[in-house]
C-alpha cells in the first residue's frame, strides 16, 4: 500500500549527501525471475523490467513538480487551453537524440502513430488517448493521418498542438492518461515497417534516447550498459558508466551482503533477510500504487459502456460496507506479514498529490465498536 505521507516513518528517502565527483562506474541490480524483454521504446513496451532497465536514457518530455503537476523546464513544455480544448507542446531547442539529431514535432506525432497503428500491436492504445481528435479514425484505418495533431511550424518544427474532444480535470497532471508524455525518433525508425518495429534492432539493440545516458552495450535479456549522452540538453551527467544487470529474487540477500552491486531494489518480503546488512544505506521508495477493497453493487453494461447500479445488491448498503471496513485489522496484518513496511492510506488520492489530498479524511481504522453500531 502507498503512504498518505511523502515519507516512510522507518526509512530515509535519500542517501547522505556528499560532494559530487565526475566519473565512476555504477552497477545496478535488476531483480526479476525472467530475462528482460528488451523492448526499449515507450510506445511498445509493457514490461516494468524494461522500463527499469531503460530509465537512464528514457526521460519524460515534460517536467513536473513534487505533486506531479506539469511545470516548465523539461525537454518540452506543455500549455493546456481548456476553452480551445487544446494542449500546446513546445520542444526545447537544445534537445537532441543520442545520435545528435534534434527532437522535432514529427517525433511526437510519430509516437502517437506507433501507439495507434494496429500493425505495431502496441498495448498502449486506450480510450483515454482516443480522446485526441482523429486518433480513433487512424487506429481503425479510416484515416492515414491523425487530424487532431497540428504542427504549425511543420514536421521539423518544435511546436505541436493537440486537439481534444473533451477536456479532463487531470490533464494538468503527469500520468493523466489523455496526453502521451514521450517521443520516438522518426528520422531513425521511419524506414522500419510498423509490423517489424517491435523486433527491430533499432528498438532492441541500438535504441536512441534524448535523456542523460545512451546505450553502449546490450546483452539481450541480461544486462544493459549506459554511457553519457554527449548531446544531453542539461549537460554531461557525472557518472562514466551505468550497468544494469538481471538477478533473481533469490539472489538479492546474498548480493547485498557481499556488496556485489551499488544499487539494488528490495521488495518488502525480502526485508527480514537483509535488514542487518552492513555498509548499506536503505532508503524508502514509496510508489503511487495501492491496494483497495471493492464491493459489487451492480454490473458493467458493455453495450452502453457504463456501470449499472443494482439497488437490491447485498452490498448496496453503506452501513454494511462501513462495518466491514471497521472490522478489518489492516494494521496488524501489515505488521505481521510485511514487517510493518506496508500501511493504510485514508483516501484514494495520497498526499503526494498536494492540494488534491484531503487531510481531513481519516479512513477506517480497526474499531469493532463502530462496526457493531
Label the predicted regions:
Residues 1-25:
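Short, low-complexity disordered leader/linker segments with a strong preference
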Amino acid at each position: 500500500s502507498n503512504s498518505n505521507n511523502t515519507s516512510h516513518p522507518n526509512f530515509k528517502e535519500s542517501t547522505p549527501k556528499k560532494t559530487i565527483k565526475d566519473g565512476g562506474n555504477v552497477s545496478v541490480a535488476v531483480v526479476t525471475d525472467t530475462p528482460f524483454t528488451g523492448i526499449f521504446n515507450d510506445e511498445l513496451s509493457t514490461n516494468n523490467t524494461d522500463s527499469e532497465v531503460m530509465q537512464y536514457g528514457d526521460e519524460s518530455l515534460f517536467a513536473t513538480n513534487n505533486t506531479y503537476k506539469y511545470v516548465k523546464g523539461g525537454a518540452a513544455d506543455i500549455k493546456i487551453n481548456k476553452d480551445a480544448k487544446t494542449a500546446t507542446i513546445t520542444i526545447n531547442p537544445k534537445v537532441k537524440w543520442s545520435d545528435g539529431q534534434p527532437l522535432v514535432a514529427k517525433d511526437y506525432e510519430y509516437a502517437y502513430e506507433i501507439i495507434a497503428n494496429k500493425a505495431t500491436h502496441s498495448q498502449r492504445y486506450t480510450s483515454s488517448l482516443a480522446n485526441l481528435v482523429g486518433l480513433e479514425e487512424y487506429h481503425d484505418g479510416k484515416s492515414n493521418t491523425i487530424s487532431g495533431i497540428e504542427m504549425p511550424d511543420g514536421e521539423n518544427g518544435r511546436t505541436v498542438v493537440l486537439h481534444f474532444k473533451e477536456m479532463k480535470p487531470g490533464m494538468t497532471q503527469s500520468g493523466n492518461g489523455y496526453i502521451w508524455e514521450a517521443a520516438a525518433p522518426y528520422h531513425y525508425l521511419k524506414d522500419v515497417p510498423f509490423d517489424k518495429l517491435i523486433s527491430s534492432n533499432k528498438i532492441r539493440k541500438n535504441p536512441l534516447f534524448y535523456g542523460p545516458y545512451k546505450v553502449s552495450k546490450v546483452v539481450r535479456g541480461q544486462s544493459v550498459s549506459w554511457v553519457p549522452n554527449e548531446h544531453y540538453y542539461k549537460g554531461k551527467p557525472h557518472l562514466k558508466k551505468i550497468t544494469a544487470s538481471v538477478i533473481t529474487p533469490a539472489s538479492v540477500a546474498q548480493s547485498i551482503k557481499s556488496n556485489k552491486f551499488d544499487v539494488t531494489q528490495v521488495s518488502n518480503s525480502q526485508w527480514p533477510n537483509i535488514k542487518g546488512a552492513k555498509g548499506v544505506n536503505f532508503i524508502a521508495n514509496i510508489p503511487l500504487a495501492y491496494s483497495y477493497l471493492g464491493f459489487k453493487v451492480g454490473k458493467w453494461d458493455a453495450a452502453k459502456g457504463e456501470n449499472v447500479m443494482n439497488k437490491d445488491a447485498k452490498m448496496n448498503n453503506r452501513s454494511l460496507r462501513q462495518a466491514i471496513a471497521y472490522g478489518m485489522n489492516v494494521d496488524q496484518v501489515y505488521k505481521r506479514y510485511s514487517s510493518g513496511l506496508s500501511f493504510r492510506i485514508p483516501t484514494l488520492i495520497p498526499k503526494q498529490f498536494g492540494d488534491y489530498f484531503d487531510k481531513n479524511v481519516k479512513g477506517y481504522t480497526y474499531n469493532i465498536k463502530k462496526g457493531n453500531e
